[in-house]
Amino acid sequence: MPVDFLTTEQTESYGRFTGEPDELQLARYFHLDEADKEFIGKSRGDHNRLGIALQIGCVRFLGTFLTDMNHIPSGVRHFTARQLGIRDITVLAEYGQRENTRREHAALIRQHYQYREFAWPWTFRLTRLLYTRSWISNERPGLLFDLATGWLMQHRIILPGATTLTRLISEVREKATLRLWNKLALIPSAEQRSQLEMLLGPTDCSRLSLLESLKKGPVTISGPAFNEAIERWKTLNDFGLHAENLSTLPAVRLKNLARYAGMTSVFNIARMSPQKRMAVLVAFVLAWETLALDDALDVLDAMLAVIIRDARKIGQKKRLRSLKDLDKSALALASACSYLLKEETPDESIRAEVFSYIPRQKLAEIITLVREIARPSDDNFHEEMVEQYGRVRRFLPHLLNTVKFSSAPAGVTTLNACDYLSREFSSRRQFFDDAPTEIISRSWKRLVINKEKHITRRGYTLCFLSKLQDSLRRRDVYVTGSNRWGDPRARLLQGADWQANRIKVYRSLGHPTDPQEAIKSLGHQLDSRYRQVAARLCENEAVELDVSGPKPRLTISPLASLDEPDSLKRLSKMISDLLPPVDLTELLLEINAHTGFADEFFHASEASARVDDLPVSISAVLMAEACNIGLEPLIRSNVPALTRHRLNWTKANYLRAETITSANARLVDFQATLPLAQIWGGGEVASADGMRFVTPVRTINAGPNRKYFGNNRGITWYNFVSDQYSGFHGIVIPGTLRDSIFVLEGLLEQETGLNPTEIMTDTAGASELVFGLFWLLGYQFSPRLADAGASVFWRMDHDADYGVLNDIARGQSDPRKIVLQWDEMIRTAGSLKLGKVQVSVLVRSLLKSERPSGLTQAIIEVGRINKTLYLLNYIDDDDYRRRILTQLNRGESRHAVARAICHGQKGEIRKRYTDGQEDQLGTLGLVTNAVVLWNTIYMQAALDHLRAQGETLNDEDIARLSPLCHGHINMLGHYSFTLAELVTKGHLRPLKEASEAENVA
């Protein structure tokens, strides 16, 4: 296994100084206390005392002794000499003239301070630590090198040579990898191994291997596509490998191995050693079995949605065609009924008078016509759905005979209907009179049960599918073995695991174990806030109480636009003029020189693999994906790092979700250290909003929305932006699903150093359930509601007098629901916090349209209280509303930069599968962050330059600057991956036309 995996930075910094230590480092590692001075004082001569003192500091700071004292920075030498009262540090030249002196001093320091050589048992302990980390995760060897270095220094082990450590890490990683391959290869029986080997051969009806065929998921939404998806899952399931055999194997490494199997070619797999080949095939089958089941159920859900949507379209067209007849009949009936209102007509004469106007037979025909074409208020075009039965019967047998559904208590009725249809659908019976009727709602009843009181085959089947879709989406019905459609409740903390972590979870979330204490605190907050806002309402010119409508409501005046002072305009202009022009290619390489983000990209299967100029290849691939232009414009046959083969190899082996996420975290964390970014915000506030992209290719991971996608389908990239303008997470959503399902996911799943505690969204992200979950998890939810004044304000004290707010505080909370479910609420929140279950999946299961569970009701009750607290703050505080608006505007402006970057192919995403979409949009977020970071660095340099020129800068103006500009960045045309030597060494490029800028100043 390759051992040359260290970056240049790691090689140069290992056991060496790379610059002057800062004041904190000097105080921590080079400060000499009285005991140190007593030990040092035993040496004779200033040169020996200074030399041994410096060696003490070096072994503390570097983990090793230096042989050449000239490599110690001047600041360290002076700092140490001052503590010893040595004025002339040139005496250090006399130190170590005898080689034995240095060796003797090193031995004395090791003995006195208990430093140890890198030998048994410490080699064994470090090897065990590295092996454990290598076994449970797929960490880069460079990261393990840093971990090992830190561990050695922590345990006062003198650092060995860099090659010794890299060789140990490579050997340990290889041993862990071989163990994984061996365990996986032993899972299948001899017969199963033979079947797995057949994956590499061609199928009967295609030149493609069976493995390549199974890699291809569904891309269309139709009955045949669903049947093919089910057959694909059955093929994988028939291998008989079971996921329970993997309980002792590391999930992360299995996932990476399976992903590698999905990316690499059959030719490469066939060339592997027998053990590795079998391990790769086993990992592929187990991972793709779950994926194939998820894909099939995704197609089912999308297909049912299409049936419902088509039924609605047909119904609306019918409605339009029948409106003329309905209007004519309605007018005739209105005229007939008007006779009933005539006071002068005796009751016994009314029928005769009506029939004189409209003959009895004609009136009966009109009534029949109205009943046929008029729709009840609860009609959801179910009649048109029944007409889709021909489409349904093409795929329903596959569904009923193949997929094994399970249910929670709320889904038992749906499961009973499913079991019934599984038995009876193959028959030719036209009536299912013995079918379970609990699923038949009032709106379906007239279409399922005919006039003769028979349950029709067509009506019952479509009624069941409608109920099945709703139950699946809410996970009342679920499929064991599926990742996306499984039971989220089974993943919550429970049993002994919950009891062991219960108190820790309560403490980490900041909630008391006694629900009465929590309710008392909430009640006090709500009561005091009501009274404070009521007392100031008459002075609040932006809010008025409107009692003219059926219900009192508040009218909130829109915020006035914030004027830009002349000083801000001038400052923005000066900074814009100073920003140097740059190609996006160079920008990426320069940001890598600052942050080393390219080091986070490692090979999917061989993490130690290194090639020359890899950052150049990675930057090219990132640009190809983010700009949506493909690799072709970036290929340079005369540049080894940019050849077609190199770029394709880099994209296949280095670009994936985990590496993109890690690289993005580096950029976000670097941005957080910049003084200018810290002026904009501390990283505690963020916003979430969606970017819409048309997907003109056939894919199941897209949805319709005429407003955003026209006649096409599309996806939403729901991304999260901090108050420092950095994007720290993104989620790909098919179509335009409710934002509220995903808003918490960005906070809980993000992997940067930021810790946002407050998030702003638009109205679509707001719901009482989300307010409740935010509070349980310790976050502040601050949406911009479209009509906050018309919202329901809730109270906990029924008899409290809130003065002018009494009329709007008309909702009465029920704390008893919270008390009953308090422990369950904390268990759910703790499971989310610990990553046991995905937020969006759990929220779907909680959002029940019918009969919400006690847990859901309790979370909603808490949400109502916290939503009311938010509303009271919102109407009372102009600055709060302004802060929300400002942060949301930052997100929208960042989208504009991302649009400018993603300019190729009309900005349309043409990836067919979810992984590809997520990788491409993750790359777009990464490159956008690189642009923001580059702008921030140079804006800081421009501000420093202006100050040096004597400009007086206003702090308020600086706080309103934005790095979301891109006019100076070339994203089109010639692409060159070269850096000036000055920038390569870590310096900034000169500001544009500095002399002219000085004249302006």
Predicted features by range, described:
Residues 807-1001:
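Long, compositionally biased intrinsically disordered regions
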Residues 56, 159, 194-198, 205-208, ...:
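Contiguous, well-ordered alpha-helical segments that form the cores/surfaces of helical PPI scaffolds
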Residues 635-674, 705-823:
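Catalytic or ion-translocation cores adjacent to nucleophile or general acid/base/metal-coordination motifs
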Residues 2-524:
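Long amphipathic alpha-helical coiled-coil/heptad-repeat bundle
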Residues 63, 634-635, 686-692, 759-764:
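Short, conserved catalytic/metal-binding motifs centered on acidic residues
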Residues 32-41, 601-617, 668, 741:
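Short linear interaction motifs
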Residues 528-637:
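Structured, charged N-terminal subsegments at the starts of enzyme catalytic cores
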Residues 590, 594, 598-600, 610, ...:
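Active-site cores of enzymes that catalyze phosphoryl transfer or operate on phosphate-rich substrates
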